[in-house]
Amino acid sequence: MTIKSDRWIQVMAREYGMIEPFVAEQVRGGIISYGLSSYGYDMRVADEFKVFTNVFNTLVDPKHFDPRSFVDIRGDYCDIPPNSFALARSVEYFRIPRNVLCIVLGKSTIARCGIIVNVTPLEPEWCGYVTIEISNTTPLPARIYANEGIAQVLFLESDEPPLVSYADKAGKYQNQTGVVPPRL
């Protein structure tokens, strides 16, 4: 596998529609940066959030997750309660090529504040808005700003395509359009 450069990302975004909307440079200056970087793409977080609350639960069970566990918030920012988490989605829509796997890592500016961003790999031929898990590990509320950088996407190209892609197996998160809670 080879990590792909800004040149490759730019061509794939423009010709294949791999990232929409695509920002061809790093946007910075008083904000958490986003856009094209040397070997990746810094995606933004949209203004839709689902913040976890324990009002309806005494146990978090991925096999029996109660969607009432989330409070929907839409705005320029989201304050995540102490020791809690939120789900959000990317501003960008991604179309991953068949021979590419993406690894997504939280931005250091956010991590250095005790806010951890988790996204599972974007698999070959997965399409959709990325659901982003954001954990506040601090004892204070933590603010996330909509339409600013949240995580960097690294593109790894394989020397051969997989036998079965995410699209082939009709993955349960294929073509997601909003913030998507856990599914079985």
Curated annotation (Swiss-Prot):
This protein is called what?
A: dCTP deaminase
**Catalytic center residues:** E133 (proton donor/acceptor)
Can you state the subunit structure given in the record? Homotrimer.
Q: Which InterPro entries match?
A: dCTP_deaminase, dUTPase-like_sf, dUTPase_trimeric
Q: Which UniProt keywords apply?
A: Hydrolase, Nucleotide metabolism, Nucleotide-binding
- Enzyme Commission number, as recorded: 3.5.4.13
Keyword flag Hydrolase: yes
Biological process per Gene Ontology, one example term: dUTP biosynthetic process
